[in-house]
Amino acid sequence: MASLFIIMDKRFAVFASSDKPNNCSRKNMFFLKNIIVLSNYLYLLYKAWIVCTTISLCCDFPLFNFLFIAIPYFTEILYNDSSLLWFLFVSLCFITLSFQSLEI
C-alpha cells in the first residue's frame, strides 16, 4: 500500500515537471494532486486504525491481536522503511498492555 503512494508521488512529480503545461494538463495535475492528498489521509487513517485496534484488543486476546497486527506490518516493512517505526510503536503498546493485563 505504501509503495502505491510512492509510485503516485513519483508520477505526479514527473507530470508536474512538464515544460509547457496547457489548461488540460493543469486540470489533470490539480486532480492528481487531490487524489494523492486524499490517499495519504486514508493511509494515515489506516495506521491510526491499527494502533487503536492494538490498544483496544491487547488486553483480551493478546496472541490473536499480535498476529492480526503483525502480518500487515511485516508486509509493509518490505515496501517502506518508515513502517518499521510504526511497527515498533505498536509492538511497544502490545508488550506494555500485555504486562498490564498480567498484573491485574
Swiss-Prot record:
The keyword Transmembrane applies. GO terms for cellular component: endoplasmic reticulum; endoplasmic reticulum membrane. The chain crosses the membrane at residues 30-50, 54-74, 84-104. Keywords: Endoplasmic reticulum, Meiosis, Membrane, Transmembrane, Transmembrane helix. It is found in: Endoplasmic reticulum membrane. Signal peptide: none annotated. Its main location: endoplasmic reticulum. GO terms for biological process: meiotic cell cycle. It is a multi-pass membrane protein. Has a role in meiosis. This is Meiotically up-regulated gene 150 protein.
